[in-house]
Curated annotation (Swiss-Prot):
Organism annotation: Oryza sativa subsp. japonica
WD repeats: 64-94, 106-136, 155-186, 203-234, 247-277, 296-326, 342-372
Example GO biological process: lateral root development
PANTHER family assigned: GUANINE NUCLEOTIDE-BINDING PROTEIN BETA G PROTEIN BETA
Keywords recorded for this protein, A-Z: Cell membrane, Membrane, Repeat, Transducer, WD repeat
Subunit organization: G proteins are composed of 3 units, alpha, beta and gamma. Interacts with the gamma subunits RGG1 and RGG2.
Protein name per the record: Guanine nucleotide-binding protein subunit beta
Length: 380
């Protein structure tokens, strides 16, 4: 049998070996943290996405609103768009023909957000009335073409900044609000199922401006706030945030999950877009443009969207630009603001069609524009 001294010696050697492995692992992790997507991609020989001004063209201008356009959403499967405007109306458009199928006059004109239900048969909207209104598009219209509200979701103590249906669930909707919370609703009953934040210490400490539900795992969603953080939530555990993500230096106006659900992007008042890893919390990339020559300030990022592959990031800005970023190399491959028939005001919202073939942008110039990849251009 081994003596006590020999056992102690073996224990010391094993401990030293474990500590050495731990140190090597720590150093390796630190090396990975110091490597962003851009540098890694370049070391792997990735080439930039090449774009010509004719690769993405404005094929439709949707005119009909008499006020600033604040929000838009595509149907998951069909070519329909809903838009919300300062004129106090929701308009449902046929994206292929530019035809308006519904022009719904709202009881509260100060609308900030709108969303289609997964089946495309209902739309939701919210704003300064602190409520989320649901409209069934199959309802009988009155003489003026308006349809009645089918359900009003009340309970927020501040404006409703964003709303999104849970994918593949017609009866579940999540809203974000100026009361620093997000709420999961049962649309059928109008009741709150869960409240995220508020009295719980892990919640946001300022207005919540945006949210995005993970299409790969609809139990998870992220919220962006005026407290310059993003929080990850599990709808099954409302009492605490799963993780908090830092990095921005201004209000986070837009959050959007990456197509694979493992990452998400953000757009902020600090003028940057950022890409985060959901699991590790690591900031993978920063997409930052040069300041305007006139005032030396960065325009704010108002809205973002990813292409279906995730290789492109579309970002709308307060000065009317709409940049197309190469997400791997952090390079701008196109600015829609420089193209023919571009917007003449702030880009307030944007979204990609479900098949990735078209981008819709909304602006304070009262118009929406549909941008399509030209025939010879492969969708990325």
């Amino acid at each position: 049998m081994a003596s006590v001294a020999e056992l102690k010696e073996k224990h010391a050697a094993a401990t030293a070996s474990v500590n050495s492995l731990r140190e090597r692992l720590r150093q390796r992790r630190q090396m990975l943290l110091d490597t962003d997507v851009e540098r890694y991609s370049r070391t792997q020989g990735r080439t930039p996405v090449s774009f010509n001004p004719t690769d993405l063209v404005c094929c439709r201008t949707l005119q009909g609103h008499s006020g600033k356009v604040y929000s838009l959403d595509w149907t998951p499967e069909k070519n329909w768009i809903v838009s919300a405007s300062q004129d106090g109306r929701l308009i449902v458009w046929n994206a292929l023909t530019s035809q308006k199928t519904h022009a719904i006059k709202l009881h509260c004109p100060w609308v900030m957000t709108c969303a289609f239900a997964p089946n495309g048969q209902s739309v939701a909207c919210g704003g300064l009335d602190s409520a989320c209104s649901i409209f069934n598009l199959n309802s009988q219209a009155d003489r003026d073409g308006n349809i009645p509200v089918s359900r009003i979701l009340t309970g927020h103590k501040g404006y409703v900044s964003s709303c999104q249906y849970v994918p593949d669930q017609e009866t579940r909707l999540i809203t974000s609000s100026g009361d620093q919370t997000c709420v999961l609703w049962d649309v059928t009953t109008g009741q709150r199922i869960s409240i995220f934040g508020g009295e719980f210490p892990s919640g946001h400490t300022a207005d919540v401006l945006s949210l995005s539900i993970n299409s790969s795992n609809s139990n998870m969603f992220v919220s962006g706030s005026c407290d310059a953080t993003v929080r990850l939530w599990d709808i099954r555990i409302a009492s605490r945030a799963v993780r908090t993500y830092h990095g921005h230096e201004g209000d986070i106006n837009s959050v959007k999950f990456f197509p694979d659900g493992q990452r998400f992007g953000t757009g902020s008042d600090d003028g940057t877009c950022r890409l985060f890893d959901v699991r590790t919390g690591h900031q993978l990339q920063v997409y930052s443009r040069e300041p305007d020559r006139n005032d030396n300030e960065l325009p704010t990022v108002t809205s973002i969207a990813f292409s279906i592959s995730g290789r492109l990031l579309f970002a709308g800005y307060s000065n009317g630009d709409c940049y197309v970023w190469d997400t791997l190399l952090a390079e701008v491959v196109l600015n829609l603001g420089n193209l023919q028939n571009s917007h003449e005001g702030r880009i307030s919202c944007l979204g990609l069609s479900s098949d990735g073939s078209a981008l819709c942008t909304g602006s304070w110039d009262k118009n929406l524009k549909i941008w399509a990849f030209s025939g010879h251009r492969k969708i990325v």
